[in-house]
Amino acid sequence: MNFVQYKNGNYDVFIDLDSGTKIRKNDLDFFEANTVESMDIKITNCCNMGCPMCHENSTPDGKHGDILSPSFLDNLHPYTELAIGGGNPLEHPNIDEFLKRCKERKFICNITVNQKHFIENYNKIKNWVDNKLVYGVGVSFYRTSNKLIELMQTIPNSVLHVIAGLIELNDLNFMANNNLKILILGYKQVRRGKDLYNNYSMHNMINYNIDTLRYYIKHIIKDKWFNVVSFDNLAIKQLDIKNILSEDQWNEFYMGDDGQDGEQTSASMFVDMVERKFAKNSCAPEDERYDLLDNVEDMYNFLKNRNNE
């Protein structure tokens, strides 16, 4: 274990840099943050995959964000977790320099890439991990692949990302029992994701797959198909995860509301460096994305106060 520690509001945060495990601790019965612990940060809208469910409408000629000029990033506290994505973040011409600067400031950088790009750029990504420029690698599932399993097994902090509604049980079964970690994301009805969902045949398929996964998820967890099974807040809601956990388990594992249903108690947010906007999460519609401010505390408190009104 390789824990780092800092204080956020009325509690202490402990992060194991080796496993990615995070622990919040205080002697009270509630956590009150005063800044972000983690941030989804979109650095480019460029991607050649053309995924029909893409909630960012990324395209091959999508713009890159300015990630090197002075900004709020210069004032983030050490050990802030950055989940770097896009688009395809590997396309950004300044990503190497950006990661070096983040390491100097002791940020914990994780990167999310499509399965195809992960396999094609494995050596580059593995080098980032070996040099502690990147700690975690999220791999967005595309199709079942023995090659994918083989490469992910060489990066202990790699996590398979799948989308409820698009992932099928047979695909999960293929990837299971290979010492992998998995993150299940909720289906986002945003931009192309909304268009896809509104297609009648896809609408029925997505709902069927969500219903199927909701039924089998307790067995997937109990039978240890994956070393770690985690969820974003949207998947927690769509799959009714709270219903399969005891109250003690829920209180132990749940990291807080992200503002989808009003209240925001999590210490996270979304930043679009391409459009220079921030929001409570990446599900936020255009009218709930706001112009970047000079420091992250102001942005976090703006979102927190707005969502708690």
Predicted regions and their residues:
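N-terminal [4Fe-4S]-dependent radical SAM core
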Residues: 1-40, 250-252
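Canonical Radical SAM [4Fe-4S] cluster-binding loop centered on the CxxxCxxC motif
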Residues: 28-68
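Core AdoMet radical
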Residues: 38, 57-67, 79-92, 102-121, ...
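Residue-level recognition of short loop/turn positions
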Residues: 50, 86, 274-275
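Alpha-helical scaffolding segments of alpha/beta enzyme cores, especially the outer helices
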Residues: 71, 94-104, 127, 150, ...
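Short amphipathic alpha-helix with an adjacent loop that forms part of the alpha/beta core around
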Residues: 73-75, 122-129, 172-173
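Radical SAM enzyme [4Fe-4S]-AdoMet core and its adjacent flexible, acidic
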Residues: 132-298
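Cysteine/selenocysteine-centered motifs that mediate thiol-based redox chemistry or coordinate metal-sulfur cofactors
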Residues: 300-309
